[in-house]
Amino acid sequence: MQLQGLVFVFTIGILLSRVPTGTVSAVDPEVNMNVTEIIMRWGYPGEEHSVLTGDGYILSIHRIPRGRKNHFGKGPRPVVYLQHGLLADSSNWVTNIDNSSLGFLLADAGFDVWMGNSRGNTWSLKHKTLSVSQDEFWAFSFDEMAKYDLPASINYILNKTGQEQIYYVGHSQGCTIGFIAFSQMPELAKKIKMFLVLAPVLSLNFASGPLLQLGRLPDPLLKDMFGQKQFLPQSAMLKWLSIHVCTHVIMKELCANVFFLLCGFNEKNLNMSRVDVYTTHCPAGTSVQNMLHWGQVFKYRKLQAFDWGSSEKNYFHYNQSFPPSYNIKNMRLPTALWSGGRDWLADINDITILLTQIPKLVYHKNIPEWDHLDFIWGLDAPWKLYDEIISLMKKYQ
């Protein structure tokens, strides 16, 4: 892998040597900032909190307790929790400019905004007893995110704010773990006022794109290719590429196309001046086991717990020889859902099936021209989506 990386960097260097001078844009300062620094750069108060899960992981949660102009409002603010998708982190909600990022818009609308980070991403790489160098640290998938991360994060927020309920907004895998947690743990579901679902991925029957090709490979081969620990974390090489490649006018489009190749194409709706910021925060990493789990969702055509590879191991974990399926029909939360017509991962045909399984669906909107990333980075997201989210949450106060 190291040799391939050197060859790639060398090739990029040759390409850049042929790019005319004067075509390099300035590096955005947010490239070198953490999430709290990005929040504060735009004039908002920013906080970082540490949450201990039941199985010993230490997660970071970022908070925007109020907007820029409503410092002195009386009484507690309604709380909203934002949960990122696969290979992402809390920065997703604040890496557009202030009037285009959901995190900032919610704060200005009077909400107390909390942004989670799943175990294994850039901001959640700690454990009480385990080190990231140990295989045991990485023995998790979205099962554990639903079983441990969400309850710990939600209960921490409720204890900190004194609230009894929160709004939950999920994107992609952030929806997946919400559906699992709220259908499996009714006591946790009682703490959610409304479930707002953006581009949910629960099945991959109709999904497409290069990322899905990994799901066709046998698990042992994937482990040989990627190991058993971390998958696609932020790294020094990625940051170098973001700063030295993605700031070139000609190369920005190439950097953006990496995202489009994975998620679907809607080139005109991405703020190209922010590409270097996006790529220095995403991908943010996950475990190889989590990627194997998504491969199993693709192969088995259903949402179920992780298959440990043998009847004996499954029996040890589940008291049965095969992994149990998740029944989201058990979830009884008011749910609003938004989908995209060009979304390769949350395909509209999978969404159509999902809609029939949500007992308390209160709203659905499909945006025909949107891909998977428009929900977090789309230039038109403020008026096509975020205004509706804010209106619905205020309606359900």
Curated annotation (Swiss-Prot):
Residues spanning the membrane = none
Q: How does it assemble?
A: Monomer.
UniProt subcellular location:
Lysosome
Its Gene Ontology biological processes? acute inflammatory response; adaptive thermogenesis; adipose tissue development; ATP biosynthetic process; blood vessel endothelial cell differentiation; bone marrow development; cell morphogenesis; cell population proliferation
Give the signal peptide, or none: 1-25
What keywords are assigned to this protein?
Glycoprotein, Hydrolase, Lipid degradation, Lipid metabolism, Lysosome, Signal
User: Which InterPro entries does the entry link to?
Assistant: AB_hydrolase_1, AB_hydrolase_fold, Lipase_euk
Supply the name of the protein. Answer: Lysosomal acid lipase/cholesteryl ester hydrolase
